[in-house]
Amino acid sequence: MPIFSNKQVRLKRLGLALIPVCGLVAALLLIPTIWGEYARILLFTILLYVTMALSYDVVGGLLGYLYLGHGLFFGLGAYTTALALKHSQPLLLALLLGACLALPAAALLSLPLFRLRGAVFALATLGLLLLGGQLTSNLSWWTGGAAGLSLPPNHDPMLTYSLALILSLIVVGVHWLLCGSRLGLKLSSTRESEEMAESVGINCGQVKRLALIFSAV
């Protein structure tokens, strides 16, 4: 009987897992071409929520913090992307700019936020979300207010859908890798007991800040 190393077993399992994933991706690309625009918009919305849910799970699930301000970073990235598109920037560059702006915002906000715990942390993140919404309304000359921004309809809908699919696949892959990584174990340890995690040498403050940055980007 052949003996396989752990690495070979993991690679074999990964190869087997890629078969249904490739089939699912092919189906997601074919469905909009068969059922038209309604199916494309519906699947685009689902992919968007999958991306949001998995990015939220880094702080809300792996770290175990009740985190009510995730929409702030999502909105910041979305508005940055929309403003870049409105100024005739390429779609890929606009998406990159959105992520690049969310990263320093999360890094800065993580410093005061993670001095708080429990319900106080949850209320603080909710307050930031409400503050972001109020700023959006007050700066309507720039953000479009409650109506949002109107973008030039010069992008191929299937290209936008394909990018959303690629983004969601990247987020799923990164989340899966994170769960099995050292950082993922540190997040789980911090969730169970910050005191115990600190006692074995885990820098809980740094781990929590990294979690928020991962989640925001």
Where are these regions (language model features)?
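Transmembrane alpha-helices and adjacent helix-loop boundaries
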Residues: M1-V217
